[in-house]
């Protein structure tokens, strides 16, 4: 915690004499290009590599996992040649959901990029924060390793399907104004193998993961409170992504959903065809935030029911990104029939999210 506080203090002191940089704008005519867009985009304000999934132990017990690396450009002048200038920050979160524990196990790190200790490289996915790593290998598989205080994840995630460009060929609107957008793509249905270590004992795991890649310079409307998002790997090989951005007045500022079937055909749903309906809430005993952990999401004539693996999947990241949110493994039914498993993210329920 002290290291993080010193880092923030150093940034604020330096910013007093720094010329504010001009961040790159998200433009609708810019197309995704690979492997370039697997890597970092340092000219944009915010970016993340976000992997979630379900794992199974040899005795069949389910686990949920989340590994996220963030890159954030600061207000410091990027033309400053000093190696000590904190122009980029790297932040990481990791979490493990296990009903046997009854709570979310999680950890976090943050550091300014530089000196080989923290970086987010351009050209392909290669992100490091001390001994936490996320890298795309020559065979297209992603390898991530994080060593938390209560657990270690060492996972290999291998794509089995084509990249799913979200929105309009990767241009994803997040509000009515042109600047409120991101470049966004997903890699659903990834095959996972590796190990989870707790209390010094590694256990082999297999499973299925979802990777989200997103970068932006102006993500949220000033009146936004937070968002609800889900990414679901469906049992028939399909993939569902849906989100809504909630206003501070309780309204829905923006929403979008996309369903890609097993043949690769994508159906995009506009706001008038989408509805998020809370079914049950859980109140955190630590923060008193109430989260709608059980949701029904309607996309067109389909109703998806999301049920949490466990209620307590609250992640307190105030020591790194400053936010508290709920992010957890969920089972999913389609019109009342079991259909798949995924992750649900609920932000802005303690206080408005700033991004």
Over which residues does each language-model region extend?
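Bacterial N-terminal signal peptides
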Residues: 3-14
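Structured soluble/peripheral alpha/beta segments that form catalytic or ligand/cofactor-binding pockets
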Residues: 19-355
């Amino acid at each position: 915690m002290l290291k993080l506080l010193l880092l923030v203090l150093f940034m604020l002191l330096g910013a007093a004499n720094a010329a504010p940089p001009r961040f790159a704008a998200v433009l609708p005519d810019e197309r995704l290009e690979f492997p370039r867009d697997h890597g970092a985009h340092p000219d944009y304000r915010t970016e993340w590599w976000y992997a979630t999934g379900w794992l199974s132990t040899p005795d069949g017990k389910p686990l949920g996992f989340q590994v996220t690396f963030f890159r954030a450009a600061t207000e410091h002048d990027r033309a400053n040649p000093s190696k000590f200038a904190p122009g980029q920050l790297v932040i990481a979160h990791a979490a493990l959901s296990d009903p046997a524990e009854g709570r979310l196990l999680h950890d976090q790190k943050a550091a300014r990029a530089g000196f080989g200790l923290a970086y987010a490289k351009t050209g392909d996915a290669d992100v490091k924060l001390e001994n936490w790593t996320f890298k795309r290998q020559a065979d297209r598989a992603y390898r991530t390793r994080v060593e938390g205080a209560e657990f270690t994840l060492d996972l290999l995630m291998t794509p089995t399907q084509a990249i799913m460009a979200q929105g309009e060929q990767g241009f994803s609107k997040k509000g009515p104004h042109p600047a409120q957008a991101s470049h966004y793509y997903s890699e659903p249905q990834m095959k996972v193998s590796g190990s989870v270590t707790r209390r010094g004992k590694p256990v082999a795991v297999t499973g299925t993961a979802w990777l989200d890649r997103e970068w932006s310079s102006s993500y949220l409307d000033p009146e936004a409170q937070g968002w609800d998002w889900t990414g679901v790997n469906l049992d028939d090989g399909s993939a569902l992504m849906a989100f809504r951005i909630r206003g501070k007045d309780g309204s829905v500022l923006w929403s979008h959903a996309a369903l890609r079937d097993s043949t690769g055909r994508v159906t995009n749903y506009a706001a008038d065809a989408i509805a998020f309906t809370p079914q049950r809430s859980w109140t955190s005993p630590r923060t008193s935030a109430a989260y709608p952990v059980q949701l029904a999401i309607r996309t067109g004539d389909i109703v998806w029911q999301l049920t949490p693996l466990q209620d307590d999947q609250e992640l307190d990241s105030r020591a790194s990104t400053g936010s508290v949110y709920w992010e957890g493994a969920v089972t999913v039914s389609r019109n009342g029939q079991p259909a798949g498993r995924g992750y649900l993210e609920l932000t802005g329920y303690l206080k408005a999210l700033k991004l």
